[in-house]
Amino acid sequence: MEEFQGYLELDRSQQHDFLYPLIFREYIYALAHDRGLNRSVLLDNVGYDKKSSLLIIKRLISRMYQQNHFLISVNDSNQNRFLGYNKNLYSQMISEVFAVIVEIPFSLRLVSSLEETEIVKSYNLRSIHSIFPFFEDKFPHLNYASDVLIPYPIHLEILVQNLRYCVKDPSSLHLLRLFLHEYYNWNSLITPQKSIFAKSNPRLFLLLYNSYVCEYESILLFLRNQSNHLRLTSSGIFFERICFYEKIKYPVEEVLANDFPATLWFFKDPFMQYVRYRGKSILASKETPLLMNKWKYYLVNFWQCNFYVWSQPGRIHINQLSKHSLDFLGYLSSIRPNISVVRSQLLENSFLMDNAMKKLDTLVPIIPMIGSLAKVKFCNTLGHPISKSTWADSSDSDIIDRFVRIGGNLFHYYSGSSKKKSLYRIKYILRLSCVKTLARKHKSTVRTFLKRLGPKLLDEFFTEEEQIFSLLFPRASSILKRFYRGRIWYLDILCINDLVNHE
């Protein structure tokens, strides 16, 4: 970061705070390639590792210096005049560089804010699992929740315009607009199949989408704070307002009995709990469904008026937490009553009291999990394990290590599940799939293969959790059995990778 800031200060003194000339600097491409701006971003390196070289970078920069390559030919719209024959490679390189350049104002602002407030960086706050303790603390006291899918912008121009508040260089925005116009399907709707979370050029589109969501949430937070401020306003203001308009027609006692509570209830906005991960968010409240419906239609109008995004109100469902589950971050979360019986002794009489408390219940969605395993050929659609034929050419240790790593990651992430029964079923599928893969490699049956190598072949599947729990508790069988049933949230999980990434 210090080296990056040194380069940036040199360019600032020469270019008057313009970010546009940075695209012609070779070190920017090196920073984009090495992810020197933020090495903690856990994204797959799908770029140009084996193809990038200084010669390719120089060739690309020389092409960008020629002005005729920036001209868009209306007649020859199918011809890529700028990138030439290396369209995919050059497009990937420019996309990564654009992401680095646009991240500069955000990164410098973050560094300055940390230095001013002297905040110690806590990477645990970035963990995905940190959301679930918030659920356990807040959601048992709430009644209704709404799943909200943040709509994708129908035009990439909306994403570019959101950057104009942070990126003050118009040339950089114009160049970004030109790049997206010529090398991406500019006027098409961003569909889930071609979403911004696709594995091609993820960094730039994640930055554009996050800026879009950031502006949406900043406006939403401002309005929510205004509603809370209105909620704390003295009730005398509303009382005087009601009396001013109604004292001629009705006596004061009738106003107090009828109109005043209703009007005060109308102005009092509920305290909303808001949680988001990527494009999915949850709004939860303790109030009535009527006020939740008001928030729903407000969000729809808010998207249409501010971001020109059309959304159907019927796609936002309001569910009662005690009767429905929330599908969020791979868990099925619901609120269930936890009844405990307490014996009370009063002089010579004793009686039992049922104490009902609400508790957050987190379950593993077994059917989608089996579907994911079937998609990557660990089992069929019914959940019966099958051999992984594409791994049969690897060594035995490599095959076992892959299966153990996938099983360990799944157990690590779903350690917060209230019930581990379905999770052990997933582990059974992986174990038997591993044995069938090894038996296929050695051209043998599963029974004869296990007899020949013994039961110690798959001990790593059992010792994986013991190694994790031994770091937290003493190694004792009774303690381990007790905590296997409990749930533990880990604060070191920064991203979710699907099983396809393990190929």
UniProtKB/Swiss-Prot annotation:
Any GO MF annotation of the entry: RNA binding
Major localisation: plastid
Claim: Nucleus is one of the keywords in the record: no
GO cellular component: chloroplast
UniProt keyword list: Chloroplast, mRNA processing, Plastid, RNA-binding, tRNA processing
Localization per Swiss-Prot or TrEMBL: Plastid, Chloroplast
Entry superkingdom: Eukaryota
An example Gene Ontology biological process: mRNA processing
Function description: Usually encoded in the trnK tRNA gene intron. Probably assists in splicing its own and other chloroplast group II introns.
Similarity comment: family membership: Belongs to the intron maturase 2 family. MatK subfamily.
This protein's name: Maturase K
Source species: Rubus ursinus
